[in-house]
Amino acid sequence: MGLTYQLIPVLVCLLVCTSHFVHGHKCDITLAEIIKTLNILTTRKNSCMELPVADVFAAPKNTTEKETFCRVGIELRRIYRSHTCLNKFLGGLDRNLNSLASKTCSVNEAKTSTSTLKDLLERLKTIMKEKYSKC
């Protein structure tokens, strides 16, 4: 027996509503995981936290949030691929940021001022907490 014509719009509406709920919930989970990792990293006393990184937040005003997250990911990869400390946390953070970032971006280290890994992570944590409060 086929579906009645009155039932089809109801099912479509339920499908759309469920899809919207799942996507919104994913945002919360990813951001919460990023914030949790950042909390762990920023409380660690580790010499790697003083490593110099490009100040990716000192980008032009027209830089999108996705481009900024992409640039942060590039700096994190540069650190955890060339140093043996904090690889697990930085790698996980990079993977989670990748889901929020644009696929291509560049960091011009010659023109960019430097900061420390700890400063970068602290600023990222502030941004993520603000983003989480709006999600």
Swiss-Prot record:
It is found in: Secreted. Disulfide bonds join C27-C135, C48-C85, C70-C105. Glycans are attached at N62. Participates in at least several B-cell activation processes as well as of other cell types. It is a costimulator of DNA-synthesis. It induces the expression of class II MHC molecules on resting B-cells. It enhances both secretion and cell surface expression of IgE and IgG1. It also regulates the expression of the low affinity Fc receptor for IgE (CD23) on both lymphocytes and monocytes. Positively regulates IL31RA expression in macrophages. Stimulates autophagy in dendritic cells by interfering with mTORC1 signaling and through the induction of RUFY4. Residues 1-24 form the signal peptide. This is Interleukin-4. GO terms for molecular function: cytokine activity; growth factor activity; interleukin-4 receptor binding.
